[in-house]
Regions:
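Short helix- or helix-capping micro-motifs
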Residues: 24-27, 116-124, 169, 173, ...
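Short acidic/glycine- and proline-prone juxtamembrane loop motifs at membrane-interface regions
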Residues: 125-139
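Transmembrane-lumen/periplasm boundary regions of multi-pass, lipid-linked membrane glycan transferases
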Residues: 38, 171, 182-282, 292-295, ...
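Loop-to-helix entry region of an early transmembrane alpha helix in multi-pass inner-membrane enzymes
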Residues: 65-69, 79-98, 129-133
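Membrane-interface alpha helices of multi-pass inner-membrane proteins
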Residues: 55, 116, 161-177, 212-213, ...
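Hydrophobic/aromatic-rich transmembrane helices and adjacent perimembrane loops
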Residues: 56, 260-263, 286-291, 295, ...
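Membrane-interface transmembrane helices that cradle and orient dolichyl/undecaprenyl
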Residues: 105-111, 146-161
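Transmembrane-helix signature of polytopic, membrane-embedded enzymes
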Residues: 95, 100-122, 141
Length: 323
């Protein structure tokens, strides 16, 4: 009887995996097909990223370099058509969707991971950005890889996952400096959850940070020799020189998150977070919340003090889809 139950469980898991991969493949194929037939010209940022891809460097005025490298690869293979410039977006989103599913499977089991992958794939912001090229796309991909690697480190303590975490952190930072939130969230998660505190004093964290620093160091040197151009631009974006009390901007940012995540899902997320904060949540749920709430709170504060774009908290929704 036990053997039959195990076989049935294995069959269900295989069926769910097959269905998830099928859905991801179908959505990705449809999105690529729509890109191929689209007449949409490159908008301002996309055109700028494409121009960077023609002159590869370790950094640029407004962004780190990875977006230019990605475009360089796709246009080298397929030419400089608009669809080729944007081709990496649906492909990377497919990878992020799979990583989100694996995160949910590790935390909550086999029953939810199928829907987690599908939910991420069909989020309004993900659907929209699949037809554009932006720095958020590779950022979300490497964030999801880093989150899964972190989960595996805490579970297995294997060195290989620390190496993967360092690579994901480094490439994420080369995508967009918002990857730095991951360090804040991880520090908070490990400090709050007693059984994870060992990580903060382990060689795993040193290895991960060292690898990330090696990967990001050329961009740091580029910034140094370029008068900290990108850092200055980030400071201009933060813009704390004006009115520091903008309740309307904070409210507007929070309202825009319903458009990013979807109004129904955003409502469900708020209800879930309130429920977890009011009741006794598990360590796994607390851990996941640490990769959601701090980001939304930091960017909401930024909106209150100055302004914030709707996508600035995008990485929070990797964990949110699993929650």
């Amino acid at each position: 009887m036990v053997k039959v139950q195990k076989e049935n469980s294995s069959d269900e898991s295989q069926n769910s995996t097959f269905l998830l991969l099928s859905v991801i493949s179908i959505f990705t194929a449809i999105r690529i097909t729509l890109l191929l037939t689209s007449q949409l010209s490159l908008h301002g940022d996309e055109a700028q990223y494409w121009s960077w891809s023609q002159d590869l460097n370790w950094g640029y005025f407004t962004k780190p370099p990875l977006i230019a490298w990605v475009i360089h690869v796709t246009t080298l293979l397929f030419g400089n058509a608009e669809w080729a410039v944007r081709l990496s977006s649906p492909i990377l989103h497919a990878g992020t969707s799979l990583a989100c599913a694996l995160i949910a499977k590790e935390i909550f089991g086999k029953k939810v991971y199928l829907w987690t992958g599908i939910i991420f794939l069909t989020l309004p912001a993900v659907s929209f950005s699949s037809f554009l090229i932006s720095t958020d796309v590779p950022l979300l991909f490497f964030w999801s890889i880093a989150l899964y690697a972190m989960l595996q480190i805490l579970k297995t303590r294997h060195l290989s996952w620390a190496i993967l975490l360092g690579i994901a952190l480094g490439l994420g930072l080369l995508s967009k400096y918002a990857m730095g939130y991951f360090l804040i969230c991880s520090l908070l998660a490990c400090a709050l959850i007693q059984k994870h505190r060992w990580f903060l004093k382990s060689y795993h964290v040193l290895i991960s940070i060292l690898i990330a620093l090696v990967i990001i160091s050329p961009n740091i040197f580029w910034n140094f020799y370029s008068g900290w151009a990108t850092v200055t631009h980030l400071g201009d974006n933060i813009n704390l020189k004006g009115n520091l009390f903008n309740l309307g901007n904070a409210a507007s940012f929070l309202a825009e998150q319903a458009g990013v995540f979807g109004p129904i899902l955003f409502g469900v997320l708020i209800a879930s977070v309130i429920k977890l904060l009011r009741s006794k949540s598990t360590d796994a749920e607390k851990w996941l919340l640490c990769y959601i709430l701090p980001i939304v709170m930091i960017v909401t504060l930024q909106a209150f003090l100055s302004r914030a774009n709707a996508n600035w908290a995008a990485v929070a929704y990797v964990g949110a889809t699993a929650l």
